[in-house]
Amino acid sequence: MKLKSFIGVVVAAMLSFVMVSCATNEAKFELGDNSPVVPLGVTKGETTHYLTDYYPQWVGADKVTSSDERLTLTNLAEDWSEFAITTDADAFVSSVEVWHDGKALSIVVLGGKRDTEGSYMSSVGVEGGVVKVEATQPVKEAVAVWQNNIIEDVVVEGNSIAVAIPVIAKDYARSVVRIFAASEGGRFNDILLPLEYGNVVTEAKDIRRQDHQSQVLYSLMIDRFNNGNSANDWKINSPEVLDKVDYQGGDLAGITAKIKDGFFADLGITTIWISPITQNPYDAWGQNVNPDTKFSGYHGYWPIYSTVVDKRFGTEEELREMLSTAHNDNMNVILDYVANHLHINSPVLQEHPDWTTELILPDGRENIALWDEQRLTTWFDKHIPTLDLERNEVCEPMTDSALHWVKNFDFDGYRHDACKHIPLNYWRMLTHKMKSAMPERNMWQIGETYGSVELIGSYVKSGMIDSQFDFNLYHTSRDVIVDANRSMRDIAAVVEESEAAYGSHHTMGNITGNHDKPRFISLAGGDMPLWGIDDKAEGWHREVVVGDMDKGHAGLQLLKAIIATVPGVPCIYQGDEYGVPGANDPDNRDMMSFDGYNDYQMKEYAQTQAMMKYRRASMPLMYGDIRTLYVDDAAWVFLRHYMGEWVLVGMNVRDTAKSLRVELPSFAQCGALEVAVATEGASASCLGGGNIEVVLPPYGYAVISK
């Protein structure tokens, strides 16, 4: 059924709901922080849930209810702060209502797993305040929410869904409608539609910097980025410390200078992630062998004082200037914060030496770098003891220290270090304090966890952390691009796995690399082997280069095409925008260069600029659903679609060109095509009947729009 005729059938049925929703449900809308909360996942049997994981401001509730007979709710605490849901159903969508003082907000309930084989739905249009969605299979049931309020009248007809936008949405500068549905075969992808005063946002110019799905991150290490104030330069200047691991002079003023000269804006960056700024020691610690050297705390990860700006990076006034300059340039700044440990000479540990976990295990071993065996207690090194954050008397003051930076400075959120090693109660307490103290601040938190999607996802809740870096996507992409024995199917599979685990509109960080990994371009170019070497030692004993320049730069460009076009938030590590080579830490932390690029690097920079700017200008890439149209060992072609607009992406990881024919879904008609961003030699053309031919050069990609 065409959009107009379908809308005509349902508008009359919905009109009464649209007109009276303000009068009947307004009390619900005023309850607490109504920022959209993540869905609640259940499986057959009983699952336990914590209220603050969804509504972090609420310590408890009067009751939690559901009108769905498939769900049995059990109160596990007097105040419903902990409750259980029991169900025998599978692959369904529903909701529960959380009540407080006679008012309620909802949590969407998703049963079973997402069907990534054939259950897709897409937003195809809006008319008269009614959104139409088309699915690939008959829809069994659907749930739609505005913020966290159930939209009562949702019309389902065959493969179509119609959802009315509540009139009250017109009173809000930014709100969202989310749509969830299931077929007999499984759950569909979910749909998220940002609204501007009640109207669906269809143009990127109306997206705001606080809209998290629109972010493009840039990760920088302050000391190694730009020196803007030589008056605060300082080195240990000891024969015990090689210059490579001593302070180099980068500071907050240097970041401000690069914001002002347009460096970040020219790259399409919307959010700057800065390394830790807390006071670190003035002496040297740790010990490297061959070559022998100790280390300074130039990186910022050895906090002495958790609430003091390290004067080698600048002053509080310079920090405020940097933040205001970024905001005036329509950019966010998030702070890298270290909660897992303190330096052994921290006054806090001098006063409370018992606040750490045990260094010696019962079997006599030292509890150092036992990342998985002793995940929540292991120390990183002897001079940075891990805090016992499972104890309330430790967790309370340490979350207060973290809160200091967003209460007293206008940061837009955090990048949290070593999340994997910090217990869940810390994240619940910190986010509760943040939401309670500053409910009007739309802050974003992203964490660092290596592990399974289950472990990573256990932290991704509205009452804990918004997202994490998707290291599984990075490692899979790295291996497929570098190793010809790996398959492009592996990348497609991990993208589907992430969508199923974190949601279709997750804001997981998709990285080009980071300060703890060898430079990707040296892996892709072959100068750094993937396996069988000490990737840190390589940087001490030789000059690590790209290797095969053509292959190295093509591989890095392909990686950036992946992270910018799949769901999630792309993140550029400093230097990767132009392709600086290097081994692992500390060779991947050389001082940043802003000029003097060779021809390859200039081309690399231009590709990064074009890709990230296009991503920020494309509603389908920021908010669209994703479906695979073709995949084999060498190539992957997928579609991103949003409100009738689509982008086709093709990628080829082999050294021979690929010519592929793909068929578009019925609602994504072919027309005049534009190759928006692509490797030289890529092309696309309409063949009729909804078919497109895509030509991809060796190690090439193409981003195509209509």
Over which residues does each language-model region extend?
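Bacterial N-terminal signal peptides that target proteins for export
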Residues: 1-10
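Bacterial N-terminal signal peptides
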Residues: 9-18
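Carbohydrate-interacting/catalytic domains
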Residues: 21-37, 79, 97, 106, ...
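Substrate-binding/active-site clefts of carbohydrate-active enzymes
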Residues: 211, 215, 225-409, 429-438, ...
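Hydrophobic faces of well-ordered beta-strands that scaffold small-molecule active sites
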Residues: 216-218, 272-274, 333-335, 414, ...
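A solvent-exposed, charged loop/short amphipathic helix patch at secondary-structure junctions
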Residues: 232-250, 524-547
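Active-site-proximal helices and loops of the catalytic beta/alpha 8
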Residues: 341, 401-403, 407-511, 561-565, ...
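Aromatic-lined glycan-binding groove of carbohydrate-active enzymes
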Residues: 494-536
